[in-house]
Every structure is written in structure tokens, then in C-alpha cells.
């Protein structure tokens, strides 16, 4: 109940702040053009702010410990492997970090190819062979080299804009319909209108998440292909086979899970950020 209240309160606060900002900027959201500007500013703005602080957020939320000076042979091998793969991929050396988790997982994040972070869990580091880990690292380096963080940020910005724009257009249509059938012609009223917008934001948001998940799955196949080139097809397949045999991964924060090696499994594949491991293995074997 508390989470629902916070979600509603946050949404209303965002709407209030957005309205104030648009008023200051002189943008008239009662027109389609003004509404589209409003939607684009907040749709892309939120996505790019998330991208800009992605490394900082990852370190804070996942408790990542960046390896500045390797403390043992395992950390030294980890850093050297990422450095070698980054050079092969033609990108600047990412920061390398370890985070405490029993899950066998890893992720890449960062605002650009030259400002990125590759992090692995302790569960993966001590639960896989070096060949398997090399495949995982190559997958994450490929995400960085392919510019997937920026690509998905642009996609997220587009769908955010759609959600904000469509929700308010539909809410306006509903408001006009109610107003035309109301003797006083008052329509929904401010709070009812905001409630309708909130519900529509949630509904369109579900549709948007399906679209983003679809593109995320495509990028996963591309990262697997890149990993096969950097580390060898056998190592990438071995890593995926090892993940398939292990327990289901618990969910990471959304901004990291899209670029993780192991996504959360779901009955509805269209909601998954990662294709099923069986399909990824089959795609690699067929390539």
C-alpha cells in the first residue's frame, strides 16, 4: 500500500512540477504543439538524466566496488581480460567492478562508449570457470561497443514521449466528452482529470515497456554475437549453458538489468528484457 501511495504521490508531483515549468517557459499545453513539446522535454529529459547518472546509480544501488588496484590474481585477470576485450572492440577501457550477490550475473552501464562500467557479481566470479566468465565479460563489453545504452535511452525517450502525449490527449477527449454531457460544462475537474491521466500513464506505460523490452531482446542477440567474436563462440555458449543450469536470477534495477547477462525469466516473453537462454544458445549455434 505504501508503494502504491508513493507511486501516486510521485506521479502527481511530476505533473505539478511539469505544469509549473511549462508555465514558466510559456509553453501552452492546451494545444497539440505545446503538449508535444511538453511530452518530449519530460520524455527525453528523464531518459537522458537516467543515462547521465547511470554509472553513479549503479555503484550506489548495487554496492559496486571498483577495482583501482587489483588485490589478487582473480581481480588482476578480470581487469586484464576487460582491457584486452575493450581494445579488440575499439573502445576506451571501462571501469571494472565487483558487487556482492549470490546471483551469477553481470552488467554494463554508462553514458557513452568512453565512459562505461562493467560489473560482475561475486556469485558469477566464483561460480564460473574463467572461460565462461570471459564469455560474459565479452557480452558486456559488446553492449558498450554497440552503444546499447544510448540506443535504448533514445528508444525510452520516444516511448516516454508517446506515453505522456497519448495519456493527456485521451484524458482531454474524455474531459471534453464529460463536459459536453454536463449541464454546467465543467468536465472532470482538476483532481479527476489528474486521476485519469495517472491511470492512462500506467496503461500506456505497460505498452511502452513491451516495446522497450522487444528492442532490448534484439540488443541481447547482438551482444551475444559480439561476445562470440571477442571471446569465441564456445566460451559464450558455455557461459549461457552455465546460466541455464543455475537458479533464476533475482531482479536488478531496471537501468542495469537491460544490460545484464542473465535476465529475469517470465511466462510472458514479450515482457522480458532478455530472450530465453535456450533461444540465445540456439541462435549462437546457428550463426
Swiss-Prot record:
Cofactor note: Binds 1 zinc ion per subunit.
InterPro entries: HtpX_protease (IPR050083), Pept_M48_protease_HtpX (IPR022919), Peptidase_M48 (IPR001915)
GO biological process assignments: proteolysis
Protein origin, superkingdom: Bacteria
Places the protein is found: Cell inner membrane
Cofactor: Zn(2+)
Pfam families for this protein: Peptidase_M48 (PF01435)
GO cellular component annotations of the record: plasma membrane
Protein's membrane topology: Multi-pass membrane protein
Similarity comment: Belongs to the peptidase M48B family.
Full protein name: Protease HtpX
Amino acid at each position: 500500500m505504501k508503494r502504491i501511495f508513493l507511486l501516486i504521490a510521485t506521479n502527481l508531483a511530476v505533473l505539478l512540477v511539469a505544469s509549473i515549468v511549462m508555465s514558466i517557459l510559456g509553453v501552452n499545453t492546451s494545444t497539440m504543439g505545446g503538449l508535444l513539446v511538453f511530452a518530449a522535454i519530460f520524455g527525453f529529459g528523464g531518459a537522458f538524466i537516467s543515462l547521465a547518472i547511470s554509472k553513479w546509480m549503479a555503484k550506489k544501488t548495487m554496492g559496486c566496488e571498483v577495482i583501482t588496484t587489483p588485490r589478487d590474481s582473480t581481480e588482476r585477470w578480470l581487469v586484464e581480460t576487460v582491457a584486452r576485450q575493450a581494445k579488440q572492440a575499439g573502445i576506451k577501457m571501462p571501469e571494472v567492478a565487483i558487487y556482492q550477490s549470490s546471483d551469477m550475473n553481470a552488467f554494463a552501464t554508462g553514458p557513452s562508449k568512453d565512459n562505461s562500467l562493467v560489473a560482475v557479481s561475486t556469485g558469477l566470479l566464483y561460480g564460473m570457470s574463467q572461460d565462461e566468465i570471459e564469455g560474459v565479460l565479452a557480452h558486456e563489453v559488446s553492449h558498450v561497443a554497440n552503444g546499447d545504452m544510448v540506443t535504448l535511452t533514445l528508444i525510452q525517450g520516444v516511448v516516454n514521449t508517446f506515453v505522456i502525449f497519448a495519456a493527456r490527449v485521451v484524458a482531454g477527449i474524455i474531459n471534453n466528452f464529460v463536459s459536453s454531457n454536463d449541464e454546467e460544462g465543467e468536465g472532470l475537474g482538476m483532481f479527476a482529470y489528474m486521476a485519469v491521466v495517472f491511470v492512462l500513464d500506467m496503461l500506456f506505460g505497460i505498452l511502452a515497456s513491451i516495446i522497450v523490452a522487444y528492442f532490448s531482446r534484439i540488443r541481447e542477440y547482438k551482444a551475444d554475437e559480439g561476445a562470440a567474436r571477442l571471446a569465441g563462440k564456445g566460451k559464450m555458449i558455455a557461459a549461457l549453458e552455465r546460466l541455464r543450469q543455475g537458479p533464476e536470477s533475482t531482479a536488478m534495477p531496471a537501468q542495469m538489468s537491460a544490460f545484464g547477462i542473465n535476465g529475469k525469466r517470465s511466462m510472458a516473453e514479450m515482457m522480458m528484457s532478455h530472450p530465453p537462454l535456450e533461444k540465445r544458445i540456439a541462435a549462437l549455434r546457428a550463426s
